[in-house]
């Protein structure tokens, strides 16, 4: 980390001049980890270009390696190569560690639950605290069995795949034939009824993404019945688009989902989009410092839901343009930001970014429908309010139609130590506040290793050029 680091804190340097920069951000975590799953389940050699290398993706890669997959990694060129085995998992037993990666935890649990092997899934205390019960219940409905080592409905667990149902444990030993997640390597029987599963996705759409991607492993197909009011979302659309790119289709009827029978993931070369979640911090930096920031290789039409944050910045008065290098955000003329009233349920990772810049808007900003973020890497609502209040910013929660939101009033942020709660997004979002306020210090800044390990180095480079 660069010049702002002192021990276990990072002292944010207030920008002396408007930030004007063109920055490169890493590949998308959401896209990288979905691509890793599909490549492992494909038949043959797949190359992933522009991959993210961070704690989350390394835990996903490490888990695949622990399961016996041949994975070649080139962190310099941001490339991962995987030999897929048509749904076969090389090792019939084993232990994986998903760290704090929600995508790895949810996606790999579904993969292993549809196998005929027995596996242990470990995680950090942070991930152990996050909900998994809805996914465990759905996979149990499909025939998997779970043994909990701690609290029921949470990691760590031992999973016994649906292919072991009614089969003695000795038949899931390493001495037997290679495990296969595809229960049949044929095309499936058109006369077979699809398997059926029910899932509540109100707390995380990763549960549905896991079932969609793993559903390809069921030869007769899978009908996914949604039991929650929420039935769709930006990350679900990412999953569906990526499955289509890898040769598999999912039908959505406006409420439920159907994964067709006899599908397989294709191999080839797949390019990982830049991480728009990471890009948003730098676009927000332009907004609060009166500057202009372009994020290289970003473009309109990208599938990541956080692209909607650009619409929020427009409502605040910023100008957004597509350039040859990438999307450029310019602060409003005169530097005055407008308050906004916005539902961020579909791109809630940016609710923290908006909360961090909202004090600079000339009025009260209201962020609707984000109650589910209490159950993520931290209680993100409480963490945001704690840090805003530490800066002497008036803020609080409200409920509308039974859904929780946050309001943030205009104010001048006072010097404060930002508690990250080991949450990468808290560290990066409030670093943006510090670009336009004095005395902002980020505690435990390296929690950003989860998704953007050199974030503060990039930030320092930007500041050094302005």
Locate each region found by the language model.
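Structural preference for solvent-exposed beta-strand-turn elements
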Residues: 1-466
């Amino acid at each position: 980390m660069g010049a702002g680091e002192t021990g276990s804190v990072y002292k944010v340097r207030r920008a002396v001049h408007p930030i004007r920069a063109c920055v490169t951000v890493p590949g998308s975590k959401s896209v990288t980890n979905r691509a890793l799953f599909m490549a492992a389940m494909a038949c043959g050699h797949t190359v992933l270009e522009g991959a993210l290398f961070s704690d989350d993706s390394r835990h996903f890669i490490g888990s695949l390696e622990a399961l016996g997959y041949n994975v070649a990694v080139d962190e310099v060129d941001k490339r991962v190569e995987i030999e897929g085995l048509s749904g076969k998992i090389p090792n019939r037993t084993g232990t994986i560690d998903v760290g704090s990666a929600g995508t790895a935890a949810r996606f790999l649990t579904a993969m292993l639950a549809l196998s005929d092997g027995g596996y242990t899934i470990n995680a950090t205390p942070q991930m152990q605290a996050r909900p998994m019960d809805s996914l465990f219940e759905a996979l149990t409905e499909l025939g998997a069995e779970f043994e909990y080592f701690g609290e029921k409905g949470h990691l760590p667990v031992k999973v016994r795949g649906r292919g072991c149902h009614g089969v003695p444990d000795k038949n899931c030993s390493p001495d037997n034939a290679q495990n296969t997640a595809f229960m049949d390597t044929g095309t499936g029987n058109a006369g077979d009824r699809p398997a059926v599963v029910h899932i509540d996705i109100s707390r995380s759409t990763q549960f549905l993404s896991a079932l969609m991607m793993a559903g390809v492993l069921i030869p007769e197909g899978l009908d996914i019945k949604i039991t929650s009011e929420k039935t769709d979302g930006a990350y679900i659309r990412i999953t569906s688009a990526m499955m289509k790119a890898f040769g598999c289709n999912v039908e959505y009827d406006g409420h439920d989902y159907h994964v067709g029978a006899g599908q397989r993931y294709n191999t080839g070369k797949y390019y990982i989009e830049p991480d728009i979640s990471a890009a948003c911090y730098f676009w927000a930096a332009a907004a609060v410092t009166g500057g202009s920031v372009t994020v290289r290789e970003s473009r309109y039409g990208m599938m990541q839901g956080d692209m909607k944050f650009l619409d929020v910045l427009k409502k605040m008065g910023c100008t957004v343009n597509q350039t040859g290098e990438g999307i450029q955000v310019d602060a409003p003329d005169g530097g005055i930001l407008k308050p906004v009233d916005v539902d961020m349920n579909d791109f809630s990772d940016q609710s923290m970014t908006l909360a961090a810049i909202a004090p600079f808007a000339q009025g009260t900003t209201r962020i609707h429908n984000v109650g589910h973020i209490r159950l993520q890497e931290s209680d993100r609502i409480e963490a945001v309010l704690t840090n805003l209040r530490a800066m002497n910013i008036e803020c609080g929660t409200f409920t509308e139609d039974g859904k929780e939101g946050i309001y943030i009033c205009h104010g001048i942020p006072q010097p404060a130590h930002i508690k990250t709660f080991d949450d990468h997004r808290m560290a990066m979002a409030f670093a943006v506040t510090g670009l336009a306020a004095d005395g902002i210090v980020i505690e435990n800044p390296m929690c950003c290793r989860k998704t953007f390990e050199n974030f503060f180095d990039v930030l320092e480079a930007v500041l050094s050029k302005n």
